[in-house]
Amino acid sequence: VYKRQVQVPHYNYVGDSILGYKSHMGAGSITSNVKSDKTLVVVKDNRDSGEEIETGLKKFGAMLGDHVEVGCNSVLNPGTVICPNCNVYPLSSVRGVIPANHIYKDADHIVAKKEK
């Protein structure tokens, strides 16, 4: 599902995903929608709560909030949630939940954006 003004312009694959208003997928970035072991997709909150949400689905890609920027050649693994106003560095492999207003550099470096 694409909301208004979504940009997926170059050699992307978006499978079974929701892309928010004015989100942008850089060249070659994909939303993977099936786990390699073919089990049901679970959304795992990798923040403090550690909550898990069972989707009951074998095919479930990613959910991107409004104004999300995904860098070139990034992979959003099944069940990834990227909250609004986030940036994902190029060549990233993202999984879990990325909180709003953050920059995903790699799995160990997810930093809050500085207010302007």
Name these PLM-found stretches.
Residues K3-K116:
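Glycine-rich hexapeptide-repeat left-handed beta-helix
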